[in-house]
UniProtKB/Swiss-Prot annotation:
It is found in: Nucleus. PROSITE patterns: HTH_MYB. GO terms for molecular function: DNA-binding transcription factor activity; transcription cis-regulatory region binding. One of its GO terms (cellular component) is cytosol. It holds the Pfam family Myb_DNA-binding. This is Transcription factor MYB1. Residues 78-101, 129-152 bind DNA. It comes from Arabidopsis thaliana. PANTHER family: MYB PROTEIN, MYB PROTEIN-RELATED. Induction: Slightly induced by salicylic acid. Residues 50-105, 106-156 form the HTH myb-type domain. InterPro entries: Homeodomain-like_sf, Myb_dom, MYB_TF, SANT/Myb. It comes from the Eukaryota. Residues 1-57, 185-274 are annotated as: Disordered.
Length: 393
């Protein structure tokens, strides 16, 4: 309770100071009392009515009163502080203090580290300038927004273009960026005391504008990103022609059953003879379930040549051999044995049929005539019985 009374007494003293300063700025007609009464009435109604609001730049006296009130009462309860400043609202007092009068503000130009932090934070939070301002002590959200719109947005766009060119993707759309104007409202930033920070270009003695270090660093950064994008594109682009490396596969060179692995030239007569004996070979393979390896290939590249040269190479390499579709006999002896077996089987079948016929003739000559007649009668009677059974059914 006592603290509240002390605050009210301090506010009353500040009001009197404001009234005295207003009376000192009265008309030259000598009607100082009327001016003082008007000022007193104006102070009394400043926090209640909106028709008495003051819009425009803050004066030096208003800045001093606001600084003194914040120093005594703290940076809180802005509506209560605004009652001591005629025509100013609590929001206006808060923005004026946070953006201009706070002694903890950093008024120097943004450093490269701060620029990188702003770009990284904007990629995460977007246009939430109050959240980004919490990451940079001494920088206000309004200052960060103005710096982004004036310098960093174009730099970020150029960086994204270079990155997209390097990755081969489409250029990012600019619709997500903040399109607000770089000029702040007069109530927030304008001041007659010159509180806001304004960067001006350096002018050389010849009268030409010299680029600042910030612009030089931006140009160097853009050139660097472009160079990195081009090199990255060269690294990621696939080669125009794919050249496979030759290597050994699962195929193995197949040697002959009889002998040496040296290739020899295939003769035309041998090829014809192998085609004639292909049917017999298939028969033998089915009988004995054996897999024969042919001695010659179908490309004509594995037969002996007096010069020792090859006429044709395999598609799989010099170590591989392309064989015929119809395999040949592994040896001439096997063909002779097969022929002999076939002739013996034919002779055996002929002998068996002739011996059966001779035996039947001998039995017919030895059988008597009576028995033959009795047998014929029995056969006829049996056939008649069978016919009657069929007709009855």
């Amino acid at each position: 309770m006592e603290a509240e009374i002390v605050r009210r007494s301090e506010v009353t003293g500040l009001r009197r100071e404001v009234e005295e300063s207003s009376i000192g700025r009265g008309d030259c007609d000598g009607d100082g009392g009327d001016v003082g009464e008007d000022a007193a009435g104006f102070v009394g109604t400043s926090g209640r009515g909106r028709r008495d609001r003051v819009k425009g730049p803050w004066s030096k006296e208003e800045d001093d009163v606001l600084s003194e009130l914040v120093k005594r009462l703290g940076a809180r309860n802005w509506s209560f502080i605004a009652r001591s400043i005629p025509g100013r609202s609590g929001k206006s007092c808060r923005l004026r203090w946070c953006n201009q009068l706070n002694p903890n503000l950093i008024r120097n130009s943004f450093t490269e580290v701060e620029d990188q932090a702003i770009i990284a934070a904007h990629a995460i939070h977007g246009n939430k300038w109050a959240v980004i301002a919490k990451l940079l002590p001494g920088r206000t959200d309004n200052a960060i927004k103005n710096h982004w719109n004036s310098a960093l947005r174009r730099r970020f766009i150029d960086f994204e273009k270079a990155k997209n060119i390097g990755t081969g993707s489409l250029v990012v759309d600019d619709s997500g960026f903040d399109r607000t104007t770089t000029v702040a409202s007069s109530e927030e930033t304008l001041s007659s005391g010159g509180g806001c920070h304004v960067t001006t270009p350096i002018v050389s003695p010849e009268g030409k504008e010299a680029t600042t270090s910030m612009e030089m660093s931006e140009e160097q950064c853009v050139e660097k990103t472009n160079g990195e994008g081009i090199s990255r594109q060269d690294d990621k682009d696939p080669p125009t022609l794919f050249r496979p490396v030759p290597r050994l596969s699962s195929f193995n060179a197949c040697n002959h059953m009889e002998g040496s692995p040296s290739p020899h030239i295939q003769d035309q007569n041998q090829l014809q003879s192998s085609k004639q004996d292909a049917a017999m070979l298939r028969l033998l393979e089915g009988a004995y379930s054996e897999r024969f390896v042919p001695q010659t290939c179908g490309g004509g590249c594995c037969s002996n040549n007096p010069d020792g040269s090859f006429q044709q190479e395999s598609l799989l390499g010099p170590e591989f051999v392309d064989y015929l579709d119809s395999p040949t006999f592994p040896s001439s002896e096997l063909a002779a044995i097969a022929t002999e077996i076939g002739s013996l089987a034919w002779l055996r079948s002929g002998l068996e049929s002739s011996s059966v016929r001779v035996m039947e003739d001998a039995v017919g000559r030895l059988r008597p005539q009576g028995s033959r007649g009795h047998r014929d009668h029995y056969l006829v009677s049996e056939q008649g019985t069978n016919i009657t059974n069929v007709l009855s059914t």
